[in-house]
Amino acid sequence: MKLILTTEVEHLGTAGDAVEVKDGYGRNYLLPRGLAIVATRGAERQANDIRRAREAKEIRGVEHANEIKQAIEGLGAVKLTVKTAGEGKLFGSVTAADVVGAIKAAGGPNLDKRTVTLPKAHIKQIGSYVLDVHLHAGVATKVTVDVVAEG
């Protein structure tokens, strides 16, 4: 089944891409959720418009991503204070959303939580962690997060 994506789909493509998928995946997942439309001549013209708009935005996006990268690198180590149960174990865990909040609180830019990659699913110990931040295709940086006990 040939479809045109309307939004970014992980491991498949971005908005405006024409993709060939199995019928069941297209009918049962992509089409009902509005992630894709059936490829017709009119839809292909619409996809070309989406693609051109995305390319224009991408040029601005790379410049903006480099500015955000400079801002993050200028922060240095980001301190994240959490409640602990003793012996360095946390109550709960530190998620990507918590890291994004700590970066914002330290005077950094507002990021999407999907841009931050944690070493495992979540951070569950006190310590210093170096995390990857993917801002744009080809633009990434690292941020050091110091997880410390509250009080």
From Swiss-Prot:
Keywords: Ribonucleoprotein, Ribosomal protein, RNA-binding, rRNA-binding. Gene3D superfamilies: Ribosomal protein L9, C-terminal domain, Ribosomal protein L9, N-terminal domain. One of its GO terms (biological process) is translation. PROSITE patterns: RIBOSOMAL_L9. GO terms for molecular function: rRNA binding; structural constituent of ribosome. It comes from the Bacteria. InterPro entries: Ribosomal_bL9, Ribosomal_bL9/RNase_H1_N, Ribosomal_bL9_bac/chp, Ribosomal_bL9_C, Ribosomal_bL9_C_sf, Ribosomal_bL9_N, Ribosomal_bL9_N_sf. One of its GO terms (cellular component) is ribonucleoprotein complex. Binds to the 23S rRNA. Belongs to the bacterial ribosomal protein bL9 family. This is Large ribosomal subunit protein bL9. It comes from Mycobacteroides abscessus (strain ATCC 19977 / DSM 44196 / CCUG 20993 / CIP 104536 / JCM 13569 / NCTC 13031 / TMC 1543 / L948).
